[in-house]
Amino acid sequence: LQENINLFYSPTDLKNNPPSSDRSIRAGGLVKEKSLLRNTDSLEIYFEITDLKNTIAVTYNGLLPDLFKENKGVVATGYFFVDKNEFQAYEILAKHDENYVPKEVEKALE
């Protein structure tokens, strides 16, 4: 049962207490402005998540949700590699309306 739980981490949590790189987790915060880069030859995407204290790099290979935008809340599920300070995501969730921020992200931004 424990192995099926995805714990939530902010960028500061990942900096201060990184999980094992073989454990799937959720990381969230705001998509940092001007950090979004797309590979023109593939679906590979790079962006950064910030909690306004620390920032982590995120790589993702796939289509982003329509509501994914810079300076908006996001939760990524995947694996964090502390040696690269990089989060490799296999799922990206974006907020679903203008006023919604996931509770975990809101708490991380406090």
Which residue ranges define each predicted feature?
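OB-fold and OB-like single-stranded nucleic-acid-recognition modules
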Residues: 1-110
